[in-house]
């Protein structure tokens, strides 16, 4: 830094002032790169304003209709990626935090829910952590929770919704496969058509492709797999049977539970075959009862997964709200400094 005394007049009358010394090259470099406090605050305001905008966009996607399409999922994923980028900028710019803000963010983001689904344990956070490290930790954990937790549930609900809609389409055809028997005490059922439709749906969702995989979420052009441990963790979290675990190449994926559909086919095989199988009322009622029980199992699974998705969405939303409050407070502090 400059030696101010070297540029001042002599403090004693009658004594010639000391000749100014030429600053060294390193001193010139220091003068050139150190921004003023005002410039630093101005940079903070820009970074904080951009982050605040991205947070609002992310919050808007969280409040939208639950994702049931690839387009909706892509929109939410993009909003989370942009939020992460803006948080990375805060980490690099070194936006300062108050002691209370530092502690609040550290305690909120040091143990994210995504750690529950990680094969390796999280390192315990240090007691003291710098503001830049806090922003970096927040950025990494927001990204991890968004992609590895909420993002998984978005994909699970989207795939299962498509699956259940396909099953509902089969149910809509049932009226055409049922007809009264000859004496009014029997019912004719087109077993072959019903069984063929259900078998086709089973075949579709037991194939491993981007449209049938629940976990891991599929993005990009290639197909992504996970380790066996990760896949098993998600099977447990989703409360699905072990049969949903499938090997794919060198990794594993989790598929839809087609067990209820297989039970339907088995029950149809048990009553016979044909395009107009005649059943007495008792036999038909017994078959219908079993069929509806499996239909209810499918519906319950979708409802359970949708509720789990809602919980994940709320968790992420709460974290974003904490982050939004901190950024808004920091932004106001930076603006007040410049106005003062």
UniProtKB/Swiss-Prot annotation:
Coiled-coil region: 291-319
Full protein name: Cell invasion protein SipD
Function: Required for translocation of effector proteins via the type III secretion system SPI-1, which is essential for an efficient bacterial internalization. Probably acts by modulating the secretion of SipA, SipB, and SipC.
Keyword Hydrolase: no
A GO-annotated cellular component: extracellular region
Keywords for the protein's UniProt record, in alphabetical order: Coiled coil, Secreted, Virulence
Species of provenance: Salmonella paratyphi A (strain ATCC 9150 / SARB42)
Main location: secreted
Annotated domain remarks: The N-terminal domain is an intra-molecular chaperone that prevents premature oligomerization of the residues on the coiled-coil region that are involved in interactions with the needle and/or itself. The residues in the C-terminal domain probably form oligomeric structures at the tip of the needle that are responsible for the regulation of secretion of other effectors.
Region described as Disordered: 1-26, 57-76
Family: Belongs to the invasin protein D family.
Gene name of this polypeptide: sipD
């Amino acid at each position: 830094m400059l030696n101010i005394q070297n540029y001042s007049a002599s403090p004693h009358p009658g004594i010639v002032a000391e000749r100014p010394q030429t600053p060294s090259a390193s001193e010139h470099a220091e003068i050139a790169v150190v921004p003023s406090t005002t410039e630093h605050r101005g940079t903070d305001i820009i970074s904080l304003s951009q982050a605040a905008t991205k947070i609002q966009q992310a919050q808007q996607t969280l409040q939208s209709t639950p994702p049931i399409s690839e387009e909706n999922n892509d929109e939410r994923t993009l909003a989370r990626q942009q939020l992460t980028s803006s948080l990375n900028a805060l980490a690099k710019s070194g936006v300062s935090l108050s002691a209370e803000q530092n502690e609040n963010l550290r305690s909120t983001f040091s143990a994210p829910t995504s750690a529950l689904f990680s094969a390796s344990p999280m390192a315990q956070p240090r007691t003291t952590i710098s503001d830049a490290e806090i922003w970096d930790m927040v950025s990494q954990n927001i990204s991890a929770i968004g992609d590895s937790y909420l993002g998984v549930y978005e994909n699970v609900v989207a795939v299962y919704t498509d699956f259940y809609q396909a099953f509902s389409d089969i149910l809509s055809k049932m009226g055409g496969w049922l007809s009264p028997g000859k004496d009014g005490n029997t019912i004719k059922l087109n077993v072959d058509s019903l069984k063929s439709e259900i078998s086709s749906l089973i075949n579709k969702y037991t194939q491993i492709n981007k449209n049938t995989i629940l976990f891991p979420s599929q993005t990009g052009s290639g197909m992504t797999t996970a380790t066996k441990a990760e896949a098993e963790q998600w099977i447990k979290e989703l409360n699905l049977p072990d049969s949903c675990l499938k090997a794919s190449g060198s990794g594993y994926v989790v598929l839809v539970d087609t067990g209820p559909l297989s039970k339907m086919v088995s029950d149809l095989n048990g009553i016979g075959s044909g395009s107009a199988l005649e059943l007495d009322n008792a036999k038909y009622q017994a078959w219908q009862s079993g069929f509806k029980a499996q239909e209810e199992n499918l519906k319950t699974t979708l409802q359970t997964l949708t509720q789990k998705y809602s919980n994940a969405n709320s968790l992420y939303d709460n974290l974003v709200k904490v982050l939004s409050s901190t950024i808004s407070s920091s932004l106001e502090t930076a603006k007040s400094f410049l106005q003062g």
